[in-house]
Amino acid sequence: MSKQTKTFEENLAELEGIVTKLERGDVALEEALAEFQKGMVLSKDLQKTLAEAEKTLVKVMQADGSEAEMD
């Protein structure tokens, strides 16, 4: 079975849905824990994608052709 890669926007929408669901507070504890774990994984993936995009932008923006890392 192949794992389909979701877009950044799809992952963000899924994370927002999880947050909304948990904020309502009408979820059973077991489901809340599972959703929280899923949200943490999504959050980590989103942060990784943003960091990679930032590195790419820094490389593109260097006028003199040199590459610099952002902190």
Swiss-Prot record:
The keyword Oxidoreductase does not apply. Keywords: Cytoplasm, Exonuclease, Hydrolase, Nuclease. It is an enzyme of class 3 (hydrolase). One of its GO terms (biological process) is DNA catabolic process. Pfam families: Exonuc_VII_S. It catalyses: Exonucleolytic cleavage in either 5'- to 3'- or 3'- to 5'-direction to yield nucleoside 5'-phosphates. Its EC number is 3.1.11.6. Its main location: cytoplasm. It comes from the Bacteria. It is found in: Cytoplasm. The keyword Nuclease applies. GO terms for molecular function: exodeoxyribonuclease VII activity. Transmembrane segments: none annotated. GO terms for cellular component: cytosol; exodeoxyribonuclease VII complex. Bidirectionally degrades single-stranded DNA into large acid-insoluble oligonucleotides, which are then degraded further into small acid-soluble oligonucleotides. Belongs to the XseB family. Heterooligomer composed of large and small subunits. This is Exodeoxyribonuclease 7 small subunit. It comes from Streptococcus suis (strain 05ZYH33). The lineage of its organism: Bacteria, Bacillati, Bacillota, Bacilli, Lactobacillales.
